Amino acid sequence: MHAVQRQIAEQLKVQPPFADQNALQAEVARRVGFIKDCLQNARLKTLVLGISGGVDSLTAGLLAQRAVKELRESTGDTRYRFIAVRLPYVVQADEHEAQASVDFIEPDERHTINIGSSVKALAAEVKAFDGLPASSVDFVLGNTKARMRMVAQYTVAGAYQGLVIGTDHAAEAVMGFFTKFGDGACDLAPLSGLVKNQVRAIARHFGAPESLVEKVPTADLEDLSPGKPDEASHGVTYAEIDAFLHGEPVREEAFRIICETYAKTQHKRELPYAP
């Protein structure tokens, strides 16, 4: 393992590969326990998570639903619940898969909040967009969509006195592949430290369909590049990112891209600067 790989893996608290099924099961139990502890320590009863249709929110949702189910069983308190929220922007191209994810999770409650009108209303009021290239406006509004989705989740959580779950994991964190104060904002991040193939492995552990587990990851935030795969944005594959984080050899160009991107996005992984 290169010293830089070791340093980054330590900073992101990357978990080692699952040695076997027993190790995977133990990690699932640990993360479910973490969610339960967070909820009980906050003295709250509700968890809220936006379900996009990707494997990250699918896996986080499965962990959350198991956590509240176990809390109901162990405490006898039926008020513990998990709310899955669909947050489409106007019409989502992969809505069928998003609904399939919600159906498989079987959350206690499901809500749908369309963020389209909110994002468009805000965009119409932003004079700073005047004269900007369409591509720049589209990119900024992509981040606005992510932030509006988190606003919606916190609104639901506020109404039900709950905590918001995030879906960030090590393979996204190392690339800074999240919107600051958007999908990067949450009360608890139960996938933290996992690489992408571990997130998929946990989804499989729950019996999730392969069509959802292996769905091509996409943030799908930009109107001018609908459904753009994450890996096209990264310039490297998730397999290469996972290998890098686990200290395995990767091609020279992938090593360079990951290291440079990690350094460039450091501000996204830190709290606001203060004097």
UniProtKB/Swiss-Prot annotation:
Protein name as catalogued: NH(3)-dependent NAD(+) synthetase
Binding site for ATP: 50-57, 167, 196, 218
Quaternary data: Homodimer.
Binding annotation for Mg(2+): 56, 172
Binding site for deamido-NAD(+): 147, 180, 187, 267-268
Keywords: ATP-binding, Ligase, Magnesium, Metal-binding, NAD, Nucleotide-binding
Similarity comment text for this entry: Belongs to the NAD synthetase family.
Catalysed reactions, semicolon-separated: deamido-NAD(+) + NH4(+) + ATP = AMP + diphosphate + NAD(+) + H(+)
Keyword Acyltransferase tagged: no
S-S bridge residues: none
Keyword Metal-binding (UniProt): yes
GO molecular function, one term: NAD+ synthase (glutamine-hydrolyzing) activity
One GO BP annotation of this record: NAD biosynthetic process
InterPro entries in alphabetical order: NAD/GMP_synthase, NAD_synthase, NH(3)-dep_NAD(+)_synth, Rossmann-like_a/b/a_fold
Function comment: Catalyzes the ATP-dependent amidation of deamido-NAD to form NAD. Uses ammonia as a nitrogen source.
Enzyme nomenclature, EC number: 6.3.1.5
Pathway named in the protein's UniProt entry: Cofactor biosynthesis; NAD(+) biosynthesis; NAD(+) from deamido-NAD(+) (ammonia route): step 1/1
